[in-house]
Amino acid sequence: KIGLHYNTCSGGTPSRTHEEYYADGTIPWVKTGEIKDNIIIHTDECITEDGVKGSSAKLLPQGAVVMAMYGVNIGMLAYLDSEMTCNQACCVFSDKNEIISRHYLFHYLYSIRDYLLLIGFGAAQQNLSQDLIKKVKIVIPPTELIKKFDEQKEPLYQTIRALMMQNDKLIKQRDMLLPRLMSGKLEV
């Protein structure tokens, strides 16, 4: 079962009534809408250290695998590119025994997403829980096979990460240049 090999936790949402939890925040805070079978390099919102201390949000390690437990992106996965926090709708996996790599876990969870959605429950909307996820059986291949899988996957992961970072730079450049082009301040 997944729970034998991975600890799970979720985060929290700092109270919006405390402006100091968000103002000038530098700690990325993941929401399920940002989990899209991707690598999360940056988030829409950041929180402060006070926001972490004053809520159930936790600092999560770089490289952690995160799953959306409910909402539009239920069952979708992401890697955290740096130390981040998340809200309570996210399930974060942390390795207990280093038998199963994060790449293997990510792809295994991806491969059983339909099953997870089938067993997900909820009155108004479908949702998953940490308890349900921890009880799901996981196929564990021999260690050597997992190592070979990781050797194949890691360069692809690094390439995807580099392309995402390059894409972010291009988006920033576009957003900077487009208003200048539209206003006539910059000519082609």
Where are each of the predicted segments found?
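Non-catalytic DNA-recognition/assembly elements of restriction-modification systems
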Residues: 1-13, 24, 29, 135, ...
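Sequence-specific dsDNA recognition surfaces
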Residues: 3-20, 33-62, 86
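Extended, folded domain segments that form the structural surfaces/walls around functional sites
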Residues: 18, 80, 151
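Juxtamembrane/interface motifs at transmembrane-helix termini
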Residues: 20-21, 38, 63, 124-127, ...
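A short beta-sheet element
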Residues: 31-32, 48-110, 119-124, 129-133
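Extended hydrophobic-aromatic, low-complexity segments
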Residues: 77-78, 102-104, 116-118, 145-149, ...
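Short amphipathic alpha-helical signal-transduction/dimerization elements
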Residues: 110-113, 117, 157
